[in-house]
Design a protein with these regions (language model features):
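Extreme N-terminus nucleophile/cap motif
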Residues: 19-38
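Coil-to-beta-strand transition motifs
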Residues: 22, 37, 47-53, 174-176, ...
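Domain-level detector of nuclease and nuclease-like folds
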Residues: 79-234
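Juxtamembrane helix-loop boundary signature in multi-pass membrane transporters
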Residues: 9-13
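A broad, structure-centric signal for solvent-exposed, well-ordered loop/edge residues
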Residues: 8, 49, 62, 104-107, ...
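N-terminal signal peptide c-region/cleavage motif recognized by signal peptidases
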Residues: 15-17
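Short, His- and charge-rich active-site/binding loops that engage polyanionic ligands
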Residues: 34-96
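Bacterial N-terminal signal peptides that target proteins for export
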Residues: 1-8
Length: 234
């Protein structure tokens, strides 16, 4: 099953309800550091103070009925080099703190939910994307997990070198667009791939589904190689 899923990820055309966008690849010279978190893994772009790639798995046992813990705030990650992204960098900017690995994917365990509220797992998103398009994609992935499928998930940010924008004193990079994939090894035909623009129009996840080949070709080489290598151990 794994080989079938991998072939879907990097070659076979699947979901085709597509609105064409042109994602911009992060400059290949950007430096990434690996940060192991409880039940998810971050590749953090230290040039943009923003996650380049987050990977995690999702099964029915990860899902429960816990909600965001009362008073839970986003915490600065001491594992990141200075200047570290802070929650205050987002204040009154019009951007939301968008989870890449969502807390709801760990709703069976309050401690694991809390672990997702770290700034190395957060990127600036327009509210429409964060609360609608991206949130719908997350719900779709959880619906597959509730149906007893094991899902392998990746999400990350694209930046354009000719339109760099930053937030706050920590200079948190504002992504031009985001990628997300939900890979289902036991039923590859259910796998879904998304390329989302970071704007106010990203309100329907189905509009931004793409083929696996379009997804793979949009990624920077460094990120694509990381995903391929991680998939072998998943």
């Amino acid at each position: 099953m794994k080989s079938r899923g991998l072939s879907l990820l990097f070659g076979l055309m699947i979901c085709t309800s597509v609105q064409a966008i042109s994602p911009c690849r992060t400059d290949e010279s950007d430096s990434l550091i690996r940060l192991q978190k409880p039940r998810f893994l971050v590749y953090y772009n230290i040039n943009r103070n923003c996650p380049a790639l987050v990977v995690w798995s999702l099964t029915k046992t990860d899902l429960g009925h816990h909600r965001r813990p009362a008073g839970q705030s986003f915490l600065t990650d001491p594992a990141c080099p200075r200047p570290r992204a802070k929650s205050s960098d987002f204040t009154r900017t019009g951007f939301q703190r968008g989870h890449l690995c969502p807390s709801a994917d760990r709703s069976a365990n309050v401690g694991l939910m809390r672990a997702t509220f770290v700034m190395s797992n957060v990127a600036p998103m327009y509210p429409e994307l964060n609360m609608q398009g991206f949130a719908q994609a997350e719900e779709h992935s959880r619906s597959l997990a509730w149906a007893n499928h094991r899902c392998l998930l990746v999400a990350g940010a694209f930046f354009s070198s000719d339109s760099l924008r930053y937030l706050g004193k920590s200079s948190v990079g504002i992504p031009d667009s985001f990628f997300r994939a939900c890979i289902v090894p036991d039923a590859p035909e259910l796998s879904v791939y998304w390329l989302f623009p970071n704007d106010t129009k990203a309100t329907r996840e189905a509009t931004f589904r793409v083929s696996s080949s379009a997804f793979a070709s949009s990624l920077r080489r460094k990120v694509l190689d990381i995903i391929k290598e991680l998939y072998k151990s998943w």
